[in-house]
Amino acid sequence: MKTRSTSSRHFALLGAFALASGCQTLAPTEKMADFNQLYASGNYQAAADSALQSAGGLSTEKQPELLWSLQAGTALTASGQFALSNQVFDAAEVLAKEEDTEHLVRKGFEKLTSTLVNNNLNRYSPTVYDGVMVNTYKALNSMFLADAQNARIEFNRAADRQRRAEEHFRSKIQAQKEKLSEEQVKAEAPAPANGYQPNRAEAEQTVYQAYPELQEWQVYPDFVNPYTDYLHGLYFMLGSSDKDDLGKARDSLRRVAGMNPNSPAVKTDLQVVNNLIRGTWRKQKLNPAVWVIFENGLGPEIEELLVPIPLFLVNDKIEYSQLALPKLKLRDQAYSHLELFAGNKSLGKTEQLASLDRVVQTEFKKEFPYKVTEAVISTIAKGAIQYEARRQGGLAGALAAGVYQAATTRADKRIWSALPKEVQVARIRPPANRKLTIKSPGLAEPLEVELPDSQFSIVYVKASAPGSQPIYQIAGY
């Protein structure tokens, strides 16, 4: 027989879970909102400082937080601190590797907390595209530092991550299946007569009705990121030392051309690399060229969607039942495109090369069934706690358990929010006086760019929000 003191201890434990969930959810959300505001306004240095502080700084005595390291590294690239950005991204890679090989005890603990509380108590789990973009940004940083050796290493790593993405994702999904299998067996176990017996299948059907956009998304095949592939191809074309390098460039540019069949820049680059491989053209004899790479806007955020589960799907003795799931919220372009001029002469404009929205949607859609299963199992477990609390503590117990479930039903809204919405590209001939003017509809002040005296130049432009002043960096070849 349960005593009143035992029930009180149980209620206190529920309260502790609810309090822990609230503390773990509210403070990071406020910090992320502050970071996003600084970053969107183009105040990249302040955004980097904020993210570094949230990550735990650069001290080797304390392990930084992975997501904040990703945010900080991106802001440092935008602010021109390329060496420091690579240092932060190096730490992020170490953390991501530890996450992939985490100890079984921690995995067991995180399985418990995701079921009884929510995933916000657990460490950030990096996506496949996180890893690809880390190496992509490290390669970009190295290009701006004129560090050809490390740029080559990082582009090779980025390409290797993309090749292994499907295998990595299968492993990740298998781990998720194993994580959920035990709870699923418990949840589907026969209940005693008149006991707690939820309808999991109908609960999941209710969830999918709240996500009609999943069927409309035009995802990329096989986790390909056209931005990474294009930079990889461009780098190995411009920095080629032999035909093996040119072969790498051609393979990457072919993939990008398959996804962007009407892109003038990609068509021209693929034509050039094919002629270089055949030996009909020589790199030293190519016409000078400028590539303008435009990181435009901001990628998706995650918002929380609460999906009410009708009580008849659960049990008439359950006071509260709903699921909390992540939902992608797309953000705006900063500008529709960039217009490029030599004085008053138009040289062309940028066009879309890659949609990072689609990159994120591709992985989100692939993982979504497992997120739903995890959320449903968590709700079933919490519903069982409610049922037992009502059986042992009456209405007061049921209400206490209902408060616990309401407080702990929270979606994991963590995402690398500093990524761009899309990437655009233009390939032009350099102005004779090496002075490039960049304009855009809605841009108050044009950018005046002094190009280096080199055969090839890459101008990297970034604008995060409508009306913000773009920044730019230059690499010459």
What are these regions (language model features)?
Residues 51-52, 89, 96, 155, ...:
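Inward-facing hydrophobic residues that define packing positions of alpha-helical scaffold repeats
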